[in-house]
Amino acid sequence: MKFSSIILLTLLICSMSIFGNCQIETNKKCQGGSCASVCRRVIGVAAGKCINGRCVCYP
C-alpha cells in the first residue's frame, strides 16, 4: 500500500510539472533491453528505457 501511494504521489507531482519531463527510476536492473513489462507493472504504461542499467519509466 505504501509503495502504491508513493507512485501515485509521484505521478501527481509529475502531472503538475511545468516542464513535463517526469520520469520514474525503478530499482529493476536491465541491459539495453526493453523495460516495457517493468513499466507496465509499476505505473501501468509501457513507456520506458534502460538507462545506466536501471529501468526508467515515463508516464
Curated annotation (Swiss-Prot):
Modified residues (Pyrrolidone carboxylic acid): Q23
Pfam families, sorted: Toxin_2
Subcellular compartments: Secreted
Transmembrane segments: none
Site entry: Aromatic residue of the functional dyad: Y58
Signal peptide: 1-22
Any one GO cellular component localisation term in the record: extracellular region
Domain of life from the UniProt record: Eukaryota
Site (Hot spot basic residue in hERG blocking currents): K28, R40, R41
GO molecular function (one): ion channel inhibitor activity
Main subcellular location: secreted
Residue numbers marked as site, Basic residue of the functional dyad: K49
Entry keyword set: Disulfide bond, Ion channel impairing toxin, Neurotoxin, Potassium channel impairing toxin, Pyrrolidone carboxylic acid, Secreted, Signal, Toxin, Voltage-gated potassium channel impairing toxin
The keyword NAD belongs to this UniProt entry's keyword annotation: no
Cystine connections: C30-C50, C35-C55, C39-C57
Keyword Signal: yes
Tissue: Expressed by the venom gland.
Record note on domains: Has the structural arrangement of an alpha-helix connected to a beta-sheet by disulfide bonds (CSalpha/beta).
Protein purpose: Blocker of A-type voltage-gated potassium channels of cerebellar granular cells. May also inhibit Kv4/KCND when coexpressed with DPP6 or DPP10. The occlusion of the outer entry of the K(+) conducting pore is partially reversible and affects both open and closed channels. It shares the same target in rat brain than BmTX3 (AC Q8I0L5) and AmmTX3 (AC P60208).
Family (UniProt): Belongs to the short scorpion toxin superfamily. Potassium channel inhibitor family. Alpha-KTx 15 subfamily.
Annotated protein name in UniProt: Potassium channel toxin alpha-KTx 15.4
Taxonomic placement: Eukaryota, Metazoa, Ecdysozoa, Arthropoda, Chelicerata
